[in-house]
Amino acid sequence: ESGKRMSVLEQDHSLFDSNSVLETVIMGDISLYQIKKEIDSLYENYSDENAEKIGSLQVKFEEMDGWNAESNAASLLSNLGIKESLHQTQMNDIDPKLKVRILLAKSLFGNPDVLVMDEPTNDLDYETITWLEDYLANFDNCIIVVSHDRHFLDSVCTHISDIDFGKINHYSGNYTFWYESSQLAARQRAQQNKKAEEKKKELE
């Protein structure tokens, strides 16, 4: 949908190796990041000719809450266990397990309209998972998550889509509701199949 922004939890941990940790997180909102870079570039080559363009870009930047971008990114990083001393470090110098947390912060940055996450709790400790669960529980927009963490799904999900034998079934509820409902449906199918077999034998 036009005007909506989708954010995806990156799986390629080397994709941002030439960027700093803080810069990587801000790149979660690529439009904001590009405006920021353009403003910086125009200031480096400042002239009367580009002053008007700088002013126009700064208006857009303010509308996107750009002046708070670094502090918002830093807050996400700190909540995900990334020390402030690492925020200006290049990504290629970061421990791979910490990169997971940084890319998670990137996906959350800027309150995207649609957030897509594949196994977001991998390599996270209990404290960080608990923080993420609380954060997502208060997230107002759409979240699409794939996870094998049952407790996480129970805490975060309000709807479950189950893909089984090429068919998609949708359930309104968390993981426990889906599990109980799917088990009940499986038992009912088994009973129906049994009755059908018994009736078939009677007719033979």
Task: Provide a role label for each language-model segment.
Residues 1-194:
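ABC ATP-binding cassette signature C-motif
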Residues 194-204:
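Short cytosolic helices in intracellular loops of multi-pass membrane proteins
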